[in-house]
A protein has these predicted regions:
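Acidic, contiguous N-terminal accessory segments
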Residues: 23-27, 128-309, 564-570
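Short acidic, flexible loop segments centered on an aromatic residue
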Residues: 64-89
Length: 807
């Protein structure tokens, strides 16, 4: 069995999750309490039944002058027939319930059931209603919001739900990891390309170490010194028996790319060589990684390492719009990302639910767009959502933004660690926060300065278009026919450019979003109809193409290339493709759900630079598995550290080993009939990126939990894009994959998890596998050394007797 004893820090989130809903407060409470329960999951095709039980906990009868608001992941509501209480969607993921004319006063202590249907499904606890609060109206005036106690009853029969982790299957899967080799010094993540033992005495680091470097590597030396001292207690001095030397690579032709480095260890000398500061930084991270699983005195065996990445772009997107991640926490992530040689932070700072970056001259974006709270007109803040609370001034995950100074500081911090930040302005869809903020600006100025009021408007008052986005918004798309829309976009781009310049950096690209524009948009807009007539357009996609080509020109005018989600490169005329190919920095291809997965290679073959963002491998917000207590989404499958590891950049159809139902995929035939990656296409695979959308995240602990350990597969595959099993088939492919996977888990077990626990990084431990055989219960776990306890106390060491009635 694989047994590991870890410090408690690594288990903290599991405990915290049990008590996440237990909040205590002395603030006034509403006169009611709610209990929510799940009903039939398929009461009608595409609908499930659920019920709120409303209880009057006050001393007075409950009248008709109230509304209860709540948040929940987006879904439609269906309520047929007469009802005493109406439930409806306000917008997106914000809902309300209120008494109808049929409502009879509810006596103190009495309860009533409010049953209704919702679309989709509900099979995990992070998707239930939350953030309930009460507003009472007296004499036509609203009172202050009051929190409503909400108890969500356990989901019925979770073990029968699709994707529920079967303990026996986990046990069988864990058997693949048997026989993992003992780790050697150079077994780090991401794996080095080549490590060879050499002649020379081993190096022992203890107490003091000398560090020598030329001036052009001073920044890398400073960071190395901080880590050696802070993590390993080594005092860096001018002269010591052991010396670390950072030096320029003598033969620059040896460098495969700008990130290439070498390390030579032996005879009291550690020499890191590279042609660039980035290469030196990579070498220092490898040195630090080799120390992770060691105890003082730190023994380093004589070795020569040659290493470089296969893919130039290795990024992680963090969504701070849905739920806010503070600057100090994002810096923590940048530091961790850099340690695994990830070199891009995709800064998703705006979406429908918030705008999180100060833009001088557009103060409403943060004065309104960064705050969520109770409102009926959104003149001062956005609607609550994702349990951000009803107080727009409270310090919650719903509120907050980065000041200009904080963002510049983040840019500098990341650049020191060779992490480039790519900002994203979601457009034209997913833009509700910006649209509402610019409406607030209009209302602020329309009487005193009409020109200023309309200068940056993103919507048209006369637009009668009817649409519903994937997230159930009806007003989240910019009007692409308004000159003010492009004025707004250019203003934000120019302010971003100025921030980068002040940080001493060059802004290369801005990600423009471009995804999930819903059907029906723009068709009721007089301005759009005028533009379509003028340009000879016949369909909504023509307007999308117009927007992205216009924005590509705006970017080019400002010395930049554009980036965007895969939609920015799809369905265009050849004339538009010719323009966009030359102006694109990156097309982020995300939809690899079966039936849509050919888009990735089609886009690369068409000459666009592609960043692989495969939902099935790299969407970190996908739940680890189907257990109802696992936070996350599951529309693209389940993603754990083995799934991210299995991704093949140059063979994406074989990147998943099971389908979305958990059934094995025939890897030998997975590519048949699919678009092949051409030689031109191969040159346009720029890199890989993980995505962490934040709809189900409620804290920074939750951010870390969903990232670690699954981000390690992303780091490994970006650095080593051609693993040993890539071109194999049948049993040889399976054996090669399992051997590599076993070594990968051994690295996680022995080096990474103990390091995370020691340094306050929250992470997930996988659940054990169980097998009942011959009257005994067998257990195993993927993490080498993890403790397995039977019931609540006994440490599992051997099979336990079990009869058919045991629980």
């Amino acid at each position: 069995m694989r047994i590991l004893k870890l410090p408690l820090a690594g288990l903290l989130f599991c405990v915290m999750a049990l008590f996440a809903g237990c909040k205590t407060s002395n603030e006034p409470k509403a006169p009611v309490a709610l209990t929510w329960e799940m009903g039939a999951s398929d009461i009608e095709p595409g609908y499930y039944e659920n019920t709120f039980i409303l209880k009057n906990i006050s001393q007075k009868p409950l009248k008709k002058n109230w509304t209860i608001y709540y948040s929940q992941l987006p879904r439609g509501v269906k309520q047929e027939g007469a009802s005493e209480v109406k439930v409806e969607v306000v917008n997106g993921n914000f809902f309300k319930m209120y008494p109808t004319d049929e409502f009879a006063p509810l006596a103190p202590g009495d309860s009533m059931r409010i049953t209704f249907l919702c679309t989709y499904k509900l099979d995990r606890n992070s998707h239930v209603p939350e953030g309930t609060y009460w507003v009472e109206t007296v004499d036509g005036k609203e009172g202050s919001p009051l929190p409503v106690a909400l108890k969500a009853l356990p989901l019925p029969s979770p073990e029968s739900m699709s994707g529920y982790p079967d303990a026996t299957k986990i046990y069988e899967s864990n058997l693949r990891l048997a026989g993992a080799p003992a780790l050697v010094q150079s077994d780090i993540l991401p794996s080095v390309k080549k490590a060879v033992a050499i002649e020379g005495d081993n190096v022992v680091l203890e107490g003091k170490v000398a560090l020598a470097f030329p001036e052009n590597f001073a920044g890398e030396a400073k960071l190395l010194k901080e880590k050696l001292t802070g993590l390993y207690g080594l005092e860096v001095v001018g002269n010591a028996s052991v010396k670390i030397v950072l030096e320029e690579l003598l033969d620059r032709k040896e460098a495969v790319n700008d990130e290439y480095y070498t390390i030579n260890i032996g005879d009291n000398l550690i020499k890191i060589s590279a042609a660039t500061p980035h290469g030196i930084f990579n070498g220092t991270q490898t040195l630090l990684s080799m120390l992770k699983d060691k105890q003082t005195p730190y023994l380093l065996e004589a070795v020569s390492i040659r290493d470089y990445p296969d893919l130039a772009y290795r990024g992680q997107m963090i969504d701070i719009a849905r739920n806010f991640t503070a600057p100090e926490n994002l810096k923590k992530l940048v530091d961790i990302f850099a340690s695994y040689k990830l070199n891009v932070l995709h800064f998703h700072f705006c979406d429908d639910e918030a705008w999180r970056l100060e833009i001088p001259g557009l103060e409403e974006l943060t004065a309104v767009g960064s705050r969520r709270g109770h409102t009926t007109d959104e003149s001062q803040c956005l609607y609550p959502c994702y349990d951000g609370g009803y107080d727009p001034d409270a310090k919650t995950v719903g509120n907050g933004y980065y000041s200009r100074e904080e963002f510049i500081d983040l840019l500098k911090y990341a650049a020191e660690r060779h992490v480039r930040i790519v900002p994203e302005i979601e457009s034209p869809g997913h833009a509700r926060a910006a649209i509402v903020s610019m409406k607030a600006r209009y209302n602020k100025y329309f009487e005193t300065d009409p020109g200023k009021a309309t200068e940056y408007m993103l919507s048209e008052p006369e637009d009668t278009s009817r649409y519903v986005s994937v997230q159930y918004y009806t007003d989240n798309v910019m009007n692409v026919a308004l000159p003010s829309t492009y004025r707004f976009m250019e203003k934000v781009i120019q302010e971003l450019n100025a921030m980068y310049q002040e940080a001493g950096l060059s802004l290369y690209t801005v990600h423009l979003g471009g995804d999930e524009v819903p059907r029906g948009v723009w068709m009721g807009s007089p301005k759009c109809q005028e533009l379509m007539k003028e340009k000879g357009m016949t369909k909504a996609h023509d307007l999308s193409e117009y927007f992205i080509t216009q924005m590509a020109d705006v970017m080019q005018k400002n010395g930049l290339k554009f980036s965007g989600w895969q939609e920015v490169a799809l369905g265009h005329t050849e004339e538009a493709h010719q323009q966009l190919r030359g102006q694109a920095a990156g097309v982020y291809c995300w939809n690899t759900v079966p039936g849509s997965d050919e888009v990735v290679y089609q886009t690369a073959n068409n000459g666009y630079p592609v960043i692989l963002c495969n939902v099935g491998n790299f969407y970190m917000d996908m739940a680890y598995n189907g257990h109802p207590d696992e936070r996350g989404l599951d529309w693209g499958g389940y993603v754990d550290e083995s799934v991210s590891f299995s991704m093949l950049p140059f063979s994406i159809y074989r990147s998943l080993r099971v389908d979305m139902a958990g059934n094995p995929i025939d890897l030998n035939n997975a590519e048949k009939g699919k678009t092949a990656l051409t030689e031109i296409g191969k040159k346009h695979i720029m890199g890989v990126q993980g995505q962490l959308f934040a709809e189900t995240i409620r804290s920074f602990d939750g951010v870390e939990y969903l990232l670690f350990p699954k981000i390690l597969g992303l780091a490994e595959r970006g650095w080593n894009a051609h693993p040993a099993w890539e071109n194999l088939s049948d049993i040889r492919e399976e054996q090669a994959f399992n051997q590599a996977l076993a070594l990968y888990y051994e690295k996680i077990s022995k080096s990474e998890m103990p390091y995370w626990a020691k340094n306050g990084i929250n992470f997930r431990l996988p659940q054990p596998g169980l097998l009942v055989k011959d009257g005994n219960l067998y257990a195993n776990v993927a993490i080498d050394g993890a403790e397995v306890r039977y019931t609540t106390c006994l440490l599992y060491t051997s099979p336990s007797p079990r009869d058919s009635t045991s629980s």
